[in-house]
Amino acid sequence: MKRVENHDIPGLHGPIPARIYWPDGPQADGPLPVLVHFHGSGFVVLGLEGHYNVCRELCEGAGCIVVAVNYRKAPENKFPKPTDDAWAATKWVVENCAELGGDVNRIAVCGYSAGGCLATVVAQRAAVEGGPKIVFQLLVYPVTVMSDDTESYRRFADGYNLTADLMRWFIRLYLNSE
């Protein structure tokens, strides 16, 4: 690892904490691909520390800059604040790509669970709004449906650590207007 730095990204709802990872070695020459990373959280828990090792591995293994985004969490920050943070962070990466040492033509988004939802939203919004160009999505067990009326919810409701009841709780905190 060449270096790791914490940074605050300007956002619609205030600063967004981020951690930026730069790789070391021969692949670190020239403009590098950039991966905007959204950690898993159920929209409620965890932060930059929870995916520190994952981000390091992605950075070193892929030879890319990783910008890990600590988006706002529910219940204090309900939808759409986390999606606003994800969009603002991605746009900031594009606007500051050269300064970071990145290649604006090789921007990817990545997310785990709730972070996968945010990565999906960013990619869809970029497509609808005509940019920024997202060349790749790495979605790891993304939350893509907010309804629990599916065969998957019934079939895997219990016994897999993340239960249907816990998912309902996360989504209720994220979407409920109370």
Q: Locations of the language-model features?
A:
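Alpha/beta-hydrolase superfamily serine-hydrolase fold, recognizing
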Residues: 3-178
